[in-house]
Amino acid sequence: MPRKGPVAKRDVLPDPIYNSKLVSRLINKMMIDGKRGKSQTILYKSFDIIKERTGNEAMEVFEQALKNIMPVLEVKARRVGGANYQVPVEVRPDRRTTLGLRWLVNYARLRGEKTMEERLANEILDAANNTGAAVKKREDTHKMAEANKAFAHYRW
């Protein structure tokens, strides 16, 4: 932590098409080597695929998917008397969003479809339907927290 106090959070500018900060954050999360244009193109094509397949607004499907991915609980390692305990803690709202976006992008990249547009679109659709690898990651995280409930009193 800096000596001058906590660092101020930088506000992300909303994206030009959907005027959403969430979409802008997803674009930033997908970006590799600073190529924002490529990242935007991939995301917008994915949203077109989603709209085509569902007939619903892509933004609504994306928000539902993200809501299904974002974790409520996670475990943090805490050292007590020479032993490490996995202590369940609640996830802060900003971290929930960050984890949700991170898992969405990571598991979309691991999928088997040919293009990233298809991978991302399918992962978002799966997440919106409460299936897919990103939702499984959330369930595993919650299971871990539930299994280590006994150590909840070590919370800080």
Curated annotation (Swiss-Prot):
PROSITE patterns assigned to the protein according to its UniProt record, in alphabetical order: RIBOSOMAL_S7
Identification of the protein by name: Small ribosomal subunit protein uS7
Self-association and partners: Part of the 30S ribosomal subunit. Contacts proteins S9 and S11.
Domain of life assignment: Bacteria
One GO term of the biological process aspect: translation
Keywords (A to Z) from UniProt: Ribonucleoprotein, Ribosomal protein, RNA-binding, rRNA-binding, tRNA-binding
Example of a GO cellular component annotation carried by this entry: small ribosomal subunit
Function: One of the primary rRNA binding proteins, it binds directly to 16S rRNA where it nucleates assembly of the head domain of the 30S subunit. Is located at the subunit interface close to the decoding center, probably blocks exit of the E-site tRNA.
Entry-linked CDD domains: uS7_Bacteria (cd14869)
Database matches in Gene3D superfamilies: Ribosomal protein S7 domain (1.10.455.10)
Protein family (similarity comment): Belongs to the universal ribosomal protein uS7 family.
GO terms of molecular function: rRNA binding; structural constituent of ribosome; tRNA binding
